[in-house]
Design a protein with these regions (language model features):
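Extreme N-terminal starter segment of soluble prokaryotic enzymes
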Residues: 24-27
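Short acidic/histidine-rich motifs immediately flanking catalytic phosphotransfer sites
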Residues: 87-94
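Glycine- and acidic-residue-enriched helix-capping/strand-helix junction motifs
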Residues: 38-52
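Short glycine-rich anion-binding loops that position phosphate/pyrophosphate groups of nucleotides
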Residues: 33-35, 99-102, 125-127
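Short beta->alpha junction loops
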Residues: 70-78
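Short, acidic/small-residue loops that bind anionic groups at enzyme active sites
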Residues: 113-130
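Short, glycine-/small-residue-rich phosphate/pyrophosphate-handling segment
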Residues: 129-171
Length: 178
């Protein structure tokens, strides 16, 4: 069944030996404003990898890690917040690249703080090494950690970490007594 699940790229739920359902860990990736232009926008800073290629790498890694993954990009802060709210009870972790909202996304910061699951902030570039106004993230205090400056690898490293954090924070099935 595990092989079939990997081939189909989806979760197959099965009852375990004790009758417990073992659902696949669900993770969310949020890409903020202008990230749909990766590969075209300032390639000397962000590289030539497109957002579609990043998402492909993330989905391939998710299959390897045996987690379910949804990637979502919006140029609108409210849409990113709505996606978090819609998944508050269904995902176990999230990666967020707030992009231009890094310095000004107060509402996104507040939405992230309200999530019951771990959230990591990722950036393709090292924001601390760029213009002084980019160096401070108002999102960072709301997240568990930040990965930056590694290009698309910030995302894949983040996915590995958030999958591990999500697995650690999942409740274990309660034992039944005879």
């Amino acid at each position: 069944m595990e092989r079939l699940s990997k081939l189909l790229g989806c979760a197959i739920l099965a009852a375990g030996p004790e009758g417990h359902d073992h659902a696949m860990t669900r993770l969310l990736v949020l890409h903020g404003p202008n990230l749909n232009l990766f590969g075209r926008r300032e390639p000397h800073i962000y590289g030539t990898t497109t957002l579609a290629q990043i998402d492909e790498k993330l989905h391939a890694l998710a299959r390897e890690l045996e987690v379910s993954l949804e990637c979502f990009q919006s140029n609108h802060e409210g849409a990113l917040i709505d996606k978090l709210h819609a998944n508050i009870d269904t995902v176990q972790g999230a990666l967020v690249n707030p992009a231009g909202l890094t310095q000004h996304g107060v509402a996104l910061h507040d939405a992230i703080k309200a999530m019951p699951f771990p959230v990591l902030e990722v950036h393709m570039s090292n924001i601390a090494a760029r213009e002084p106004w980019r160096a401070h993230s108002i999102i960072s205090p709301a997240v568990r950690g930040t990965l930056q400056g590694l290009g698309w690898r910030s995302y894949t490293a983040g996915l590995r970490i958030i999958a591990e954090l999500a697995a650690e924070s999942r409740p274990t099935p309660k034992e039944t007594t005879p």
